[in-house]
């Protein structure tokens, strides 16, 4: 089967934004204009095609990034047909992991901002992730029809808060109620959309007289930005004072793909204006799979290697999302980087060391699916029949093994005990939680050995609420949840040169004998536990050293203060002794545990608590109340910014333990007019009175 669309005409893009900037509505309009949807789905009435989990329709927020394919020939049909694979990403801060995951497999992104709210806290998080994966992006300022809409203020905020370099390629005609259309700075014409045809038809008109001067200035800035792409363009611009439409597009495209600039557009998705021009900009400025560097990975011998976006290369793909589907079971969403995959092929998973067979391949259109025979480089699709693949793993040709870089997922910061309402559901709950954990790497499940309770942990209260909710809807298991518990950690502040551990049992017959001397010292934050073997002259025989390390790894699961996991400690084994007959692995493992525990007691142990970056957006009248309340929660207020539509954005760092129930408190303090977002920042030492309270609570 030959390729239907040349790979140069592929665009794998994400649409990403803060909650309520109108991202799902924007995606809906894209599906409408590209001819896939006949009736536009509105989020307001819970009918949007991309929000396909029931919960999303109820809460009006997008949780999972559904992947959809559509085609576009330009708003005036002047382009050859391009194929868009669109990944819709959630904007809520508890789902940052979803955004991170989709960024990894995208070639470009459209950042949607609200013309009234501007650059909101979540927009900054998403921007940082796009920087991390070097994703070229455009900006689309939505909701230009709303009271308080201001395109140029959002432009200033992008520069200030995101350190971005936006280059408007259109400017708005009017704003709020009077928003009519845009001035296309390349053609220097006004684009006015026809409301009766839901924006399918439009006219090019002369630029309104009151905008002529402003349009000229902004065009000048755009041409300058394009000219900086190459010496050739710069020379022509300096000689002639202008560039042709094609040259401007080329210059802007080059710099956008190099992530030096971000073309900026505007419109109102809800009123069907501006999205069509944004689709043209996706073709003009965002990269196809062949415009970006080949994907990097490692081969069987851990040597670095790359895979080009080419059908003739060996097959390689990344599984970036799992979903459980009520009809076909598990769907594994993959992004193909190289080669071709056909139905029935076998693929190899180097992380698990397993070979698996692909059953069916489906391409999603929101949650309708089309079966396809094969997928090629640049495609995004879902495979049915893979049993043992988790998010972030590579699939490749068994004859040409490659591991594409693994994604790194954050550690959960909040935990809750969960139990089924009826005892008979225990097993069903176990299966449901395992499934959900395979889908979402930032969600973990474990059994508490002492109490036998099932503990679930995740990135925030909303995250766990949604998990419990999905258990009920998708698996029919109703559960009771305990009070949220903070995931504290322990570490040390001093170095202990000699921490001795001995395990001796000698009472006739074969005994036990293990003896180690450890140096225990603080490690850099985030480095974890490091074990160093510095034994000289065989005082501890080689074969027992892994047992010592095993002992350390076991000992760090429970700290000496309150039994929380120990982090960021470096342990060096530098001396010890053994007995020819009585020494064995168990004895050395036990000696290491005793030595580590003793050493920690002397090494200035402390409790660490998770600190959260909190940002509250509030009307100015309540700013003082909000800041006072954050301080009373042991928060450090770090700054206050003005927001585009009035009001203040307050940034603070607050311990997670003080943030439970914050949404209710904030609502009542500000009469429901303030909103907040919160994400994990880092662990920091808990003050003494807090540590004592934590220890007392654990001792009960």
UniProtKB/Swiss-Prot annotation:
One of its GO terms (cellular component) is cytoplasm. Gene3D superfamilies: 3.30.230.10, 3.30.70.240, Elongation Factor G (Translational Gtpase), domain 3 (3.30.70.870), P-loop containing nucleotide triphosphate hydrolases (3.40.50.300), Translation factors (2.40.30.10). CDD domains: EF-G, EFG_III, EFG_mtEFG1_IV, EFG_mtEFG_C, EFG_mtEFG_II. Pfam families: EFG_C (PF00679), EFG_III (PF14492), EFG_IV (PF03764), GTP_EFTU (PF00009), GTP_EFTU_D2 (PF03144). GO terms for molecular function: GTP binding; GTPase activity; guanosine tetraphosphate binding; translation elongation factor activity. It is found in: Cytoplasm. Residues 8-290 form the tr-type G domain. GO terms for biological process: ribosome disassembly. HAMAP family: EF_G_EF_2_B. PANTHER family: RIBOSOME-RELEASING FACTOR 2, MITOCHONDRIAL, TRANSLATION ELONGATION FACTOR G-RELATED. Catalyzes the GTP-dependent ribosomal translocation step during translation elongation. During this step, the ribosome changes from the pre-translocational (PRE) to the post-translocational (POST) state as the newly formed A-site-bound peptidyl-tRNA and P-site-bound deacylated tRNA move to the P and E sites, respectively. Catalyzes the coordinated movement of the two tRNA molecules, the mRNA and conformational changes in the ribosome. This is Elongation factor G. The gene is fusA.
């Amino acid at each position: 089967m030959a390729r239907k669309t040349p790979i140069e005409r592929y665009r794998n893009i994400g649409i990403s934004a803060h909650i309520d900037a109108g991202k799902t509505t924007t995606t809906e309009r894209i599906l409408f204009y590209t001819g896939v949807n006949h009736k536009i789905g509105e989020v307001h009435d819970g009918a949007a095609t991309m929000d396909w989990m029931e919960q999303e329709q109820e809460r009006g927020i997008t949780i999972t990034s559904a992947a959809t394919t559509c085609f576009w020939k330009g708003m005036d049909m002047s382009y050859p047909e391009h194929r868009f694979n669109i990944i819709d990403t959630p904007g809520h801060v508890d789902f940052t992991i979803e955004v991170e995951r989709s960024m990894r497999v995208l070639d470009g992104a459209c950042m949607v901002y609200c013309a009234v709210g501007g650059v909101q806290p979540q927009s900054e998080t998403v921007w940082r992730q796009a920087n991390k994966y070097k994703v070229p992006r455009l900006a689309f300022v939505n909701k230009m029809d709303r009271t308080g809409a201001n395109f140029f203020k959002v432009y200033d905020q992008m520069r200030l808060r995101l350190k971005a370099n936006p280059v408007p390629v259109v400017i708005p005609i009017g704003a709020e109620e009077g928003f009519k259309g845009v001035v296309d700075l390349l053609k220097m014409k006004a684009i006015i959309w026809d409301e009766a045809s839901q924006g399918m038809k439009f006219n090019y008109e002369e630029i309104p007289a009151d905008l002529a001067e402003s349009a000229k200035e902004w065009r000048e800035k755009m041409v300058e930005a394009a000219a900086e792409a190459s010496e050739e363009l710069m020379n022509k611009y300096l000689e002639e004072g202008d560039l042709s439409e094609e040259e401007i597009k080329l210059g802007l495209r080059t710099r956008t793909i190099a992530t030096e600039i971000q073309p900026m557009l505007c419109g109102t998705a809800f009123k069907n204006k501006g999205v069509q021009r944004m689709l043209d900009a996706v073709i003009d400025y965002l990269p196809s799979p062949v415009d970006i560097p080949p994907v990097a990975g490692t081969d069987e011998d851990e040597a670095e290697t790359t895979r080009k976006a080419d059908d003739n290369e060996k097959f390689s793909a990344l599984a970036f999302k799992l979903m459980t589907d009520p009809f076909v079971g598990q769907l594994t969403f993959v992004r193909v980087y190289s080669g071709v995959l056909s139905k029935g092929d076998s693929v190899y998973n180097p992380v698990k060391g397993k070979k698996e067979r692909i059953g069916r391949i489906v391409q999603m259109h929101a949650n309708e699916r089309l079966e396809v025979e094969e997928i090629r480089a640049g495609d995004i699709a879902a495979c049915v029949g893979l049993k043992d693949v988790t998010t972030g793993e590579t699939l490749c040709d068994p004859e040409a093994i490659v591991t594409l870089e693994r994604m790194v997922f954050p550690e959960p910061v909040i935990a809750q005990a969960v139990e089924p309402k009826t005892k008979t559901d225990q097993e069903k709950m176990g299966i449901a939680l395992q499934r959900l954990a395979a889908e979402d790497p930032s969600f973990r499940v474990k059994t508490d050995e002492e109490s036998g309770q099932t503990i679930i942990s995740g990135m925030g209260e909303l995250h766990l609420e949604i998990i419990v909710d999905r258990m009920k809807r998708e698996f029919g298991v109703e559960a009771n949840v305990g009070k949220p518990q903070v995931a504290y950690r322990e570490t040390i502040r001093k170095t202990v040169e000699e921490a001795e551990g001995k395990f001796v049992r000698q009472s006739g017959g074969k005994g036990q004998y293990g003896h180690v001397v450890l140096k225990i010292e603080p490690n850099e934050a985030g480095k974890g536990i490091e074990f160093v073997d510095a034994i000289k002259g065989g005082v501890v025989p080689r074969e027992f050293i892994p047992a010592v390390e095993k002992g350390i790894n076991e000992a760090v699961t429970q700290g000496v203060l309150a039994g929380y996991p120990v982090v960021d400690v470096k342990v060096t084994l530098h001396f010890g002794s053994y007995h020819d007959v009585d020494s064995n692995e168990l004895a050395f493992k036990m000696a290491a545990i005793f030595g580590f525990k003793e050493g920690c007691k002397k090494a200035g142990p402390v409790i660490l608590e998770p600190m959260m970056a909190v940002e509250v957006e509030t009307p100015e009248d309540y700013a003082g109340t909000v800041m006072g309340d954050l301080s009373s929660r042991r928060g450090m207020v770090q700054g206050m910014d003005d927001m585009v539509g009035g009001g203040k954005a307050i940034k603070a760092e607050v311990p997670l333990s003080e943030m439970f129930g914050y949404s209710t408190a904030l609502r009542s303090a500000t009469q429901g007019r303030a909103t907040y977002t919160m994400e994990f920042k880092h662990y920091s030492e808990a003050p003494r009175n807090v540590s004592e309270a934590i220890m007392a609570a654990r001792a009960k």
